[in-house]
């Protein structure tokens, strides 16, 4: 099964680390973000939605896998400053 997720890296001057906004393909608004906590660990922030929302197991594992790749990259960027 194809996972139809879009990951957008966002840099924010108010955040110590960049974060990833996660979209379902074809949607304009993200449903969650993957960020790095002050403790330098992955955080998953889910946004409120008016409709019921679900993820397949493939999508869920795809998000987690992307987060595991993103964490060391985000930390490396911060450590190099």
Positions of predicted regions on the chain:
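Mixed-charge, Lys/Arg-enriched low-complexity segments
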Residues: 41-81
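A short, structured beta-strand/loop element
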Residues: 17-55
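Alpha-helical transmembrane segments and their juxtamembrane interfaces
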Residues: 6, 37-39, 76
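Negatively charged, low-complexity tracts enriched in Asp/Glu with abundant Ser/Thr
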Residues: 1-23
């Amino acid at each position: 099964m194809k996972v139809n997720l879009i990951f957008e890296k966002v840099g924010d001057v108010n955040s110590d680390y960049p974060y990833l906004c996660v979209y379902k393909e074809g949607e304009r608004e993200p449903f969650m973000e993957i960020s790095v906590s002050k403790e330098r660990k992955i955080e998953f922030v889910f946004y409120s939605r008016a409709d019921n929302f679900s993820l397949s197991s493939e999508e869920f594992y795809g998000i987690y896998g992307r987060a595991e790749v993103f964490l060391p990259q985000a930390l490396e960027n911060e450590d190099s400053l």
